[in-house]
C-alpha cells in the first residue's frame, strides 16, 4: 500500500487510514498480553522514497518513542494489534483517501512501504473501524468542547494562541476550521495565512490565553456563547455568530478572581449562569444577563470554600432523555440540576453545594489521597466521578440518604468476582467510601460520562484521558472496572475529550490532531484478548497469570421498567420561560431568588432545605437578603415532578467477567516443601538420619532449628527472684537496725515504760524473724538463724534479770558495749554471707541451665545418629555435673562450720565464706533435686544405692545423686606404675637425709621447718586453678562433722600413702624417724572409677596432721632435691643430686595432676573448641562460644564476635531469619553485626514547608537557658513536633488538639491524626465510630 504525506484539513474517506508512528501491527500473544503497550521497532519498518529534497510532513512531526506506564493493579494489558487497529484501512473508502494517490503520479510526495511479518497476524483479532474523523492543525491545542446546537455539527478548540470553530461533515467525514477568533478572517484555513488586512495583521498583537486554557459552550438561549480563559484571572465570552472581521466577537470579560482560573462551566438548565473556580479557592457565579458590559469585576455570588485551590467545578447536568411507553413518549430528568454544583480541590476533597444555600456545603468527601484533578456528573443520577493524581478514578454517591437505596445495588452477582464492583456497602458507608474505584496507573486529567440514560449506574460508560504519555483514550464500563471496553489510540498523548452524542467521541492530542471515533464500530478489548494466554505476572517472574475461557460482557442485566399508569410524565423544561411582565435586561440572579425563581419554572426549595445552617464557607451578601415572601411562586409556572423511574430493590444478576487467576510460584513451592516435610516426618528415624547425612544443608538447618544456643531467656526468672530476695534482706536489715537502736535507747534510760515498749518491739522483731526463717527455709544450725536465736536468748535473759537491778552502772555499760560490738561483727559477717550466697546461687542456676542445654543438644545429635557430637555434649554435661556437685558440697560444709565458736566463726565467715553460697536446708544429697529434673532421659545416672544395678548392668554414666548422698564415703585411687619407684627413692632420700643430719649435728626445729615449708607451699599453690584449691580447703569441715574415721581404721589410698608416707596417719608427738619406720610399700586396691581422684584429694586435706607431715617431708627433701643454700655440695653427693632431679620431675608431675585434674571444665571446653575449629564444625564452635565464652573466656572477644556474625550470615543465606533474630536477641555480646546491625535513622520532614526537621537552633537555645538557670526540665520543651524553618507546629491531635510529640500516632481514613491514647479512648472506651473531627462515614469498625 502506498501512502502519501499528510494534507492539511483533509478528510479520511473510506478504505484507508493513517498509520501512527512507532506503532507496530502484530497479533495478540504472550508478549502482547504482558506488555503490549511498548512498541517493538522490529515489528514493522517505514522506508521513505522521495524524488525531491523536500522533507515529509510525517517526518517533521515524528513522535518520539514513548514508554507508557501501566497499573498492574487493574490487570489490563492491551494487545498491540488492538492498539494499532484504531487506524485500520478497512473502513474508509479508498477513492476518497487524501493520503492515497495514483501510483503513476510523479508528484513531489514521498511514498511509504510497510513490511510486516506474515505470521504475526491473528486471524481472530477484530480490526478497528471506528476512526471516522481526523485532522491536524498547526496551532497548539489544549481544550475541546462541542457546540450545543443540534443544527451545527460544530466543535470548539482552544489553545494559547488559537480559538477555532470547527465543523465536521458526516457525509464526507471531514473536519474543517470555520473561524479562528484570534486570527481574523480565517474561515477557510486553519493556518490563518490569509487576511483582508495583511499589513494590519502583522502589526496586531496576538491574544494569548492562559496556560490553563479551558473552553466551554453555552446551552439553550446562550448556545452561541463560548467561554475561554483569556488570561490567568479572566473569563472571556465570545459570540459564535460574529465570525466576520468587522464584528467584534467578544461579549464580555469576567475578572474577579485574584488568582488563576482552573475551570468554569455553563448551567444546563439556567443557561444564563456560569460558574468558575480557581487557585484562590473561591467559587464565583455569574449571571450573563446582568453583565452586559465589556468587563465585569464583580460576580453575583462568591463562595469561599474554606479549602485550598479548586481544580474543577461543574453544574449538575439537566439532560432530557426521552423514551416510549404505553402512554406515549416521556422524558426523564433531574429536578435538582439547576441548583446543584460540585468542586474538587488540591487537597483531594470533593464538595457539593446547593445554590439556594451556598453558605454550607451539602457533602464533603475525601476523594483522593493527592490532588483531585477533574470531576463529572452522571447524566441522570446523583453520582460524581472524580479523577486524581493518585491514578484513581472514583465513583461517589452524592444524593440524599433517603434516596440512596434507589441507586444502590444490594448484591452484585451470586458470588464475589474480582471484576465485580463493590456494592455491598450500606448507605452510610457510601458517603465515606467510593462506590467504585478504577485504578488507571496514571493521573486522570479529563473524564466524561457518556450522555445516555441509564437506570443502573454500572451500565454507564466513562471516557478517561490521562496527563502522562498514554496516547489513548480509555472508555470503561462501570460494570467491569479492570478491563476497559474500548481503547482509542492516537499518535501522541491525549489532552482532552468530549462526547458529541451517545456514539461519537472526539479528542485532541499533543500532536495538534483532532480525532473522532464511532464506538459502535470499535472492537472491545475482550474481543482482541487472547483466549489461551499464560504469562509471567510481573517483571521479576514471581507468579503466573492466566485468563479464564468465559469472556463475559460489559453490562449488567437491568430489570424491566414498569411505571404506574397514574404517573404523569411531563417534559423537563428545556428552554427559558420569561414572565410576561419581566424585563430580561433588568432581571439578575438576585431578582430571580427574591421572586421565587418564577421565571425559571423551578420548584420551591423551602420544604427541602432546613433553615438552620452550620458554620462553613463564607460568601458575599449580595444575593442572600431574602424577604419573608421570597418563597412565593407563580402558580402558572410548570411544576416539576421527579420522573426518574422507581424500581424495587431487587437483587440484580451480573454477568461475571473473566476472572484473573494468579498463580503465586513462591507460595506453590512453599506448599510443595511443606508437603514434603509432612511426608518426611512419617518416615522412620533411619531414613531421616540418612537424608541428613546426605544433605549437609538440611543437616545444618535441622541443627540450627533444634539446638539451644543460649540460656539467657531462662535466666531472667532467677534474676528477678534474686533481686526480690536481696530487697527482702535489705528491708530486714533496716528493721533490725532500727530495732537495735531503739533497744539501746531503752536500756540506757532504764524506764519501766520504755522497757514495756522494748518488749513490744522485741515481739514484733521475733514475728518478723520467724516469718523470714519459714519463708526461706533456713535450718536451725544456719548462721543467720543462730544469731537470731542468740539475740532472742539475750533478750529473754534481760527480761528475767530486769527485776534485780542492783548491779553497777559501769558493768551495765561495759556489757552493752560488748553486746553491740558482737552484734556489729555478726551483722558484717551476715552481710558478706548473704552476698556470697546470692552469687553462688546464681552460679548454681547457670550450671543447671547449662546442664539442661547440654542434655538437650546431646539428644538432638543422637536423633540424627551423630555419635561424635553426642559424646562431646555428654562429656560437657558430666563435667558440669561435677562442678555442680562441688558447689553443693561446699554449701553443706558451710552449715557444719557454723557450729564453731564466735571468734573462729567470724574469722571463718569473713575469709573463707567468700567461696561458699546459700545453705541448703535439706539433708545431704538433697541439693541435686534440680539436676534430677534435667536428666530424666537418663535416670540410671541418678539411682540410689538400693536401686543400683549389678556390675554387669552398669554403664559408664554419671552418678551425681549417689555421690552427693554418700559424700562421707572416701574413695581411693588406683596405683600407677611409677608409685613403687617413687616411694623407694623417697625412702632412700629420707634415710640419707637423716644420716647426714646426724653426722653434721644439725638441729633443725620442727616449727621452723613447718613455717618455711608453709611459705614455699603457698607460693607453689598460688598459680593453681581455684576449683582444686577450694576443694582442698572445703573438705576439712566434712571430716569434722561426720565422725566416720573414728569408727574404723583409716583405709589409705595411693595418694595417702605416697604423699603422707604413713599408713596410720601422722601423730603430732612422733618424730621424723618414727615416720620413716612406718613406711610401707603396700597399697589397697579399689574398683572405683578414675573420677574418684577428687575424693582422694579431699581425703588428703581432711586432717591437719597429714598436711603438716607432707610439709615436713618436703622441707627435709628440699636441700637434697634442689636447694644448695640449705646444705653445701659435696663430691659424694653428685649421684644423689642426679637421682633427686628425676625424682623432682616425677613429684612435679604428680602435683600437676593433683592441681590441674583432667576433668577441669574450662580445660575440657577449650580443647573441644580447638577441635571444633580445626575440623570446621561451625555449629559446635558457635554453640560453645554462646554458652561458655562469658564464663570461661574460651577465646578472644573479637574472635567470638566475628564467628557469631558469620554464623548469622549463614542463617540468612539459608533463610532462617527467625532463628537469626533469636540468636541476635539473646546474644551475650553487643555490636555483633557492626555497622550493618545499627538501627535505622528516622528523618522527619515538616508537613508544611517540606524541610528536614533538625531544630538545632532551638536545641542550642534551650540548652543555654538550662545551663544558665540550672533547670534541666527546660530541655523537655525540645522536640521534633515543630519546625524551626517555618516556625509552625505540625498537625495537632484531632481530639485533644495538642501537638503530636511522639512517633506513636494513629492516622484515620479521613486523614486526621491523633495520639494513640486519645484515639483509643474515643473509639474503644466511648464506642464511637465516626471521626472526632466530624468527618462523615465510619472511621473505625
Curated annotation (Swiss-Prot):
Top-level division of the source organism's lineage: Eukaryota
Disulfide bonds: none
Record's subcellular location: Vacuole membrane
WD repeat extents: 207-248, 256-296, 305-342, 367-406, 439-486, 489-527, 843-883, 1129-1169, 1216-1255
Protein's UniProt keywords contain Cell membrane: no
Acidic residues composition bias: residue spans: 753-765
InterPro entries, sorted: WD40/YVTN_repeat-like_dom_sf, WD40_repeat_CS, WD40_repeat_dom_sf, WD40_rpt, WDR24, WDR59_RTC1-like_RING_Znf, Znf_RING, Znf_RING/FYVE/PHD
This protein's record includes keyword Lipid biosynthesis: no
Gene3D superfamilies given in the database record: YVTN repeat-like/Quinoprotein amine dehydrogenase, Zinc/RING finger domain, C3HC4 (zinc finger)
Biased composition (Low complexity): 630-644, 814-823
Membrane topology (UniProt): Peripheral membrane protein
One Pfam family matching this protein: zf-RING_16
Feature: compositional bias, Basic and acidic residues: 951-962, 1015-1027
PTM sites of type Phosphoserine: 1036, 1080, 1087, 1089, 1123, 1133
Record's GO cellular component terms: cytosol; fungal-type vacuole; GATOR2 complex; Seh1-associated complex; vacuolar membrane
Region (Disordered): 1-39, 559-593, 600-619, 630-651, 736-765, 789-830, 941-962, 1013-1043
Phenotypic consequence of gene deletion: Leads to short telomeres.
Gene Ontology molecular functions: zinc ion binding
GO biological process, one term: protein transport
The entry's keywords: Membrane, Metal-binding, Phosphoprotein, Protein transport, Repeat, Transport, Vacuole, WD repeat, Zinc, Zinc-finger
Function noted in UniProt: Component of the SEA complex which coats the vacuolar membrane and is involved in intracellular trafficking, autophagy, response to nitrogen starvation, and amino acid biogenesis. May be involved in a process influencing telomere capping.
PANTHER family in UniProt: GATOR COMPLEX PROTEIN WDR24
Family indicated by similarity: Belongs to the WD repeat RTC1 family.
Subunit structure, as described in the record: Component of the SEA complex composed of at least IML1/SEA1, RTC1/SEA2, MTC5/SEA3, NPR2, NPR3, SEA4, SEC13 and SEH1. Interacts with ribosomes.
Further comment found in the protein's record: Present with 606 molecules/cell in log phase SD medium.
Protein name as it appears in the record: Restriction of telomere capping protein 1
Organism for this UniProt entry: Saccharomyces cerevisiae (strain ATCC 204508 / S288c)
Protein's gene: RTC1
